[in-house]
Design a protein with these regions (language model features):
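Non-catalytic accessory regions of SAM-dependent methyltransferases
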Residues: 1-22
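Non-catalytic substrate-recognition/targeting regions of SAM-dependent transferases
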Residues: 34-111, 119
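Conserved class I S-adenosyl-L-methionine
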Residues: 129-134
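Conserved SAM-binding loop of SAM-dependent methyltransferases across substrates and taxa
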Residues: 140-149
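Conserved SAM-binding motif I beta-strand of class I
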Residues: 152-157
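Mobile active-site "lid"/loop adjacent to the S-adenosyl-L-methionine
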Residues: 162, 201-234
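S-adenosyl-L-methionine
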Residues: 164-199
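Conserved small/polar residues in nucleotide/adenosyl-binding loops
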Residues: 248-252
Length: 252
């Protein structure tokens, strides 16, 4: 149970209520009634205005990309431009601000349950010079690393939409300049390429999806149970001497 707290530019408080679609063994009317009860009670208990409550339904599926869309359709340059033009709400966390999108995606741009992990990134960043964020999503960990004092960041994700979002988050917090790099690539392919260079990082944060079969990966799929050994072996070769890697996974 947690809430999204606004910042002075967009004050307020938001609540997202998400549940998996009920199995066929459950009466749809009972499932709907339960959800309506939650929508009626939760905002009162958590002191969130009704217009700031967002309900989302998830499907138990292993397909698709890392972060699903709320509606149908594919992400493209037109959608990226549309999102960039919109005035998304800004929330505050740990002295930083982040843009959130409650309407277009199942995940809104920041995972509240990662808050402790982001603080760990900032603490480790105080002793690091170069930071690498793999499977970066909207770059919130990069913002924390920059706030911790690293001199250079590299943010890698397969999605142009999320890289744009990450750059926007960095800019919102005053972290701009040629020392901050945003790379659109398949992470495993990118790691293999970097092993041929002298690029090494003092702190690497890795937050892989459980599963992905994004069309951007070609014929290859990603499964964290199958591929984590290759991933960690590759990451270990990109660490500077005395460097640290922080791995986050929600896969049981």
């Amino acid at each position: 149970r947690d809430r999204y707290e606004g910042c002075p530019q967009t004050p307020g408080r938001w609540l997202v209520i998400a549940e998996y679609a009920a199995p066929k063994t459950i009466d749809p009317a009972l499932a709907q009634a339960r959800m309506l009860d939650i929508l009626a009670i939760a905002p009162r208990i958590l002191d969130v205005p009704a217009e700031h409550v967002h309900a989302k339904a998830r499907m138990r599926s292993r397909g698709g990309s890392q972060y699903g869309k709320q509606g149908a359709g594919k992400s493209g340059s037109g959608e990226r431009a549309n999102i960039a033009r919109r005035r998304l709400p800004l929330i505050e966390e740990g002295g930083l601000t982040f843009a959130v999108n409650f309407d277009d995606y199942l995940d809104v741009g920041i995972f509240l349950d990662h808050r402790v992990t982001r603080n760990l990134v900032r603490e480790h960043a105080k002793q690091a010079r170069r930071f690498l964020n793999l499977f970066a999503y909207t770059g919130t960990a990069t913002c924390y690393a920059a706030d911790g004092g690293v001199e250079e960041t590299v943010t890698v994700d397969l999605s142009n939409t999320y890289l744009d979002w990450a750059e926007r988050n960095m800019r919102q917090n005053g972290f701009v300049g040629p020392q901050h790099h945003f790379v659109r690539d398949d992470v495993l392919v990118w790691i293999r390429d970097q092993r041929q260079t002298r690029n090494r990082w003092d702190l690497i944060f890795v937050d892989p999806p459980t599963f992905s079969n994004s069309s951007k990966m070609g014929r290859r799929t990603w499964d964290v149970q199958r591929d984590h050994v290759e991933l960690l072996a590759g990451v270990s070769r990109l660490l500077a001497q005395g460097g640290h890697c922080l791995l986050y996974t929600s896969d049981a």
